Amino acid sequence: MKTLSIKEPYASLIKNKVKHYETRSYDTKYRGEIFIHASLGKKEACDELWKMVGKVLPGYIICKANLVDSICMDDEFINEVKKNPWEYKSGYYKPGRYAWKLENVEVIKPIKAKGNLGLWNYYSLEEVMNLLSDIKYGYMNNAGNVCYSFDTFDDDYVLQSYKDMLKTKTGVCFDQVELERHYLYNRDITSYFICYYGEFLQSHTFLVVKENNKYIWFEHAWEKFRGIYEYNSLDELLNDLKNKFMNEYNILDKDKILLKSYSKPKSSINLSEYFKWVENK
């Protein structure tokens, strides 16, 4: 859903139905339902406005509303707004600026999220899984061609960016994690790498989402276990995945398995460079 980050106390003033216009220097053509996200920072406001909001939740989506209009301010409009002093004090009104009109405000269960500038997209995990539904398992080689045969994978694989993935609609787990990272960047996410270094080499990457003190294994690339799985602890999640990995590939020696988190790699690196990154970062 489209989301708007607003500093406190103004986000909570919308939630509490004191503020009905979000004032901006620019227009928007978007009309429809939006989330209101309380930014981490605070904005200067008079004591009376702070008293109207009570406890605030910076870093959380706190309500939703309908964005029904974007009004270019003129003197007549501003004079009308001034009839409601709290509305006027809750925004920056000047001819040529815009007032985004919000209606049907509804308080929701707070959702922890990282904010962004302008209108940005917040996706549920189910929505992201649906966005990935047309992604096929394959890879892009160093000539920019999409491949579904893995005969030369070790020699010509390159890691795609999320923009590449949106074009090719194809990727192995390494690539798919980067597309998932793009969609879920505003969540508490960690990417993980698991690899067996034995008589053969087998690896996998996946994403873990922390949400409401739960740990979620988000899996799309591994078709057999495609889905969203919730656990009470990170250890429980990682142990379950490790056991599934060992059973899937008939691995008996768990001491030859590396399971670790890794940070976002650069795109367009080859397989050797990718392994060096995930093994050491």
Language-model features: where?
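Structured alpha/beta reader/binder surfaces that contact nucleic acids or chromatin modification marks
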Residues: 1-127, 192
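Short, well-structured alpha-helical interface segments that form or flank functional binding sites
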Residues: 16-18, 57-62, 168, 172-179, ...
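Active-site donor-binding loop signature of nucleotide-sugar glycosyltransferases
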Residues: 104, 220-222, 264
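Secondary-structure boundary elements
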Residues: 127-168, 172, 258
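Hydrophobic/aromatic-rich core segments of domains that either
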Residues: 175-250
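Alpha-helical and coiled-coil interaction segments, frequently adjacent to or embedded
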Residues: 246-281
